[in-house]
Amino acid sequence: MEIKVLHQVMEWNEDVSAEVRRTLKDHKVCLINVMGSPGAGKTSLITALIAKLREEFAIGVIEGDITGQIDAEKIAALKIPAVQLNTDGACHIEAMSIQHILPDFDLDSLDVLFVENIGNLVCPAEFDIGENLRITVLSIPEGDDKVAKYPPVSYTHLTLPTT
């Protein structure tokens, strides 16, 4: 007997991510999933994008971490709605977590919602969270082989800025 647990988890996540995508579409919110290794510059990229976009777009941020709220506090200091999402050890954010946290935002007053995913190049790339765009931040000190070593970060993402 073969039990395909991972397959079932992925199918379930796809169903929930489709619901998240529909909800955000109904509210005209663009969800941007920002991924990268710890220290690659995800928070720095998001704060730079906030500085460039805030005059034209209403922005919110979901800060994903295993624990703590350091990055969420940095974003909140910019007067941007920010909600901390701690995974308590999980290496990625799933669509269900996004679905549960959306009511913490006034979606009718947002245009763009950034999700700073967990600092990891492996797991987050495998999970659709209902995003419209995926950005992976790669840093030069990590080496030039990340795309070759972690193919999902390159074939599932539209943008690969390097810090």
Task: Enumerate the predicted regions with their spans.
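Conserved small/polar residues in nucleotide/adenosyl-binding loops
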Residues: T156-T162
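Nucleotide-state-sensitive switch-loop elements of NTP-binding domains
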Residues: L6-E19, V29, L49, L53-D128
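Conserved lysine of the Walker
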Residues: K42
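Conserved Switch II/interswitch segment of TRAFAC-class P-loop GTPases
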Residues: G130-A148
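The conserved Walker
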Residues: P38
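Hydrophobic anchor at the beta1->P-loop junction of P-loop NTPases
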Residues: V34
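Structural motif
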Residues: L31, F114, I135-V137
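Hydrophobic positions on the alpha1 helix immediately C-terminal to the Walker A/P-loop
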Residues: L45
